[in-house]
Amino acid sequence: MSEKKWNLREKDSCRWDLVSLGEVMLRLDPGDFRVATARQFHVFEGGGEYNVARGLKRCFGLNTAVVTALADNSIGRLVEDLMYQGGVDQSHVRWVKYDGVGRTVRNGLNFTERGFGVRAAAGCSDRGYTAVSQLAAGQIDWQKIFAQEGSRWFHTGGIFAALSATTPEVAAEAMDAARRHGTWISYDLNYRESLWKANGGKQQATRVNRELVRNVDVLIGNEEDFTAALGFEVENTDEHLSQLEIDSYRRMIERVVSEFPNVKIVGTTLRNARTASANDWSAIAWHDGKLYGSIERPGLEIYDRIGGGDSFCSGLIYGLLTDHDLQWAVECGAAHGALAMTTPGDVSMATLADVERVMKGGGARVAR
């Protein structure tokens, strides 16, 4: 029997390949219009942490579950119905009684326009008092998830941690349980200034994220995430952090893993948005002192950029869960992210065959 590369829990002993913890919102997409001028919206489900579980299930065929909470009303049931299409198991969704008007509990709404040309993508979230933001330690049976059912991987991120004062405690509780049972943990820093603004600001974001990262095996984040969420500096970037030198990123990673030696792998996408419709796109990942880079895709045509990073994350994790080397995994993540941005919504509509074709350099000729 050949030696495994990543020392993950055996698939046969686990019900889940991955369990994700995070908010699932209802995304309202105005199509080619602006949010403020639209007269109709198309709906999708989405959330930074959930999108990873959905990609692994829908595109890559793995068994995944989501831990979240929803207000039990028609909007929550619409989100549930959308999640059914993605195939992510909902047995650990916590349903909260609705008060009839949303004074005490609600479901999150995310109005997002895709952008085009010189008009950037833009979002307007309505997510105060959501059911998931009120999750508290002790409400989820993590022992059941990681011991009785078993999960090879656990994923959460900085968006969930920023929702309230209690959500970091829930994330920490989940990580402790996952680690006790040998489950790998990934964390996407995903710094959102708007979420932290009323929750302690950048100082609190740094404190919370630094505590959580001490439990993490795979850390995902771009240069802004590492500076704002962890307090590290990336050299040789402009004030808007729009250009990233690979050598500077490598030096920053080395400082991160020196302070957090538990981190085995660090990954990020590299995006230079020439316009909303054309981005230079690639990805890199670090492990054991070496940096692995994907194929560069200059001027990649973008239909909807939202969720590209989450799809990179799910492709990367798929590579590791299937015991590929890190070069293959980062190529898989970059290809999946590129494909996810060719269709509307936060989540991928790609298949594994699509991803493998793009990884091999396949073009856009008609497949017959």
Where is each model-derived feature located?
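Conserved phosphate/ATP/ADP-binding segment of small-molecule kinases
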Residues: 192-289
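Conserved N-terminal subdomain of the carbohydrate kinase-like
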Residues: 63-158, 355-368
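Conserved post-catalytic alpha-helical subdomain immediately downstream of the catalytic base
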Residues: 276, 292-362, 366-368
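Hydrophobic beta-strand scaffold residues
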Residues: 64, 90, 185-187, 220
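Positively charged, low-complexity intrinsically disordered leader regions
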Residues: 1-36
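Catalytic-core regions built around general acid/base machinery
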Residues: 169-182, 207-215
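Alpha-helix C-terminal capping segments
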Residues: 44, 52-63, 85, 319-322
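Short catalytic helix/loop segments, enriched in acidic residues and glycine
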Residues: 34-54
